[in-house]
């Protein structure tokens, strides 16, 4: 998802983009970034956009995204929106793994946005609509809905994304996110 969002931002705006990328399986974050982008857009030359892309090795699971205070503050004081598609997206595994990335990681992103008064654009999943409504199966679930009685707790991925959305909605209501 992130590569597609980046592509749209690069080709349809003039924005400067800061990408916080984590290392994975001992693969350098910058190398991983280029591999992912070129997988989806093999004919696109990122060098054409290098003056607008700032790649930052970080980790949303760590305090300050595992960045030095100065770099964290620089980001907070120099960006005008956050688009978060960070997520553990497999559908099976241990709930703790999903919680750490999809809920606790989202909490750290949310706290960053609140601290620096930056709008957050959060990418979720239609899966939060659940597997059907418990009491009234004929109700339609839309992007304006959150909890309408749907069943979502049987899948660890869906449950974690539901909890992340709940966290963000509460931050919007209580913390002026």
Residue ranges of predicted features:
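N-terminal Rossmann/SDR dinucleotide-binding element
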Residues: 1-85, 95
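Active-site helix adjacent to the Tyr-X3-Lys
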Residues: 4, 104, 162-163, 167
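Short, well-ordered alpha-helices that flank and scaffold nucleotide-derived cofactor binding pockets
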Residues: 7-11, 111-114, 170-173
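Conserved Rossmann-fold NAD(P)-dependent oxidoreductase catalytic core, especially the SDR/UDP-sugar
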Residues: 76, 81-86, 92-100, 104-159, ...
């Amino acid at each position: 998802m992130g590569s597609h969002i980046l592509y749209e931002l690069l080709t349809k705006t003039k924005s400067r983009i800061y990408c916080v990328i984590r290392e994975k399986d001992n693969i350098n974050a910058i190398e991983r970034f280029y591999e992912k982008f070129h997988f989806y857009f093999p004919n696109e030359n990122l060098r054409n956009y290098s003056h607008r892309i700032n790649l930052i090795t970080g980790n949303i699971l760590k305090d300050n995204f595992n960045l030095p205070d100065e770099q964290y503050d620089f980001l907070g004081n120099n960006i005008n929106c956050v688009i978060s598609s960070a997520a553990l997206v497999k559908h099976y595994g241990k709930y703790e793994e999903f919680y750490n990335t999809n809920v606790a990681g989202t909490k750290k992103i949310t706290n960053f946005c609140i601290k620096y008064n930056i709008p957050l654009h959060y990418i979720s999943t239609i899966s939060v609509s659940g597997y059907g409504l418990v009491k009234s199966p004929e109700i339609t679930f839309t992007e304006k809905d959150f909890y309408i009685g749907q069943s979502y707790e049987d899948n660890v991925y869906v449950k974690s994304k539901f909890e992340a959305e709940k966290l963000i909605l509460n931050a919007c209501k209580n913390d002026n996110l």
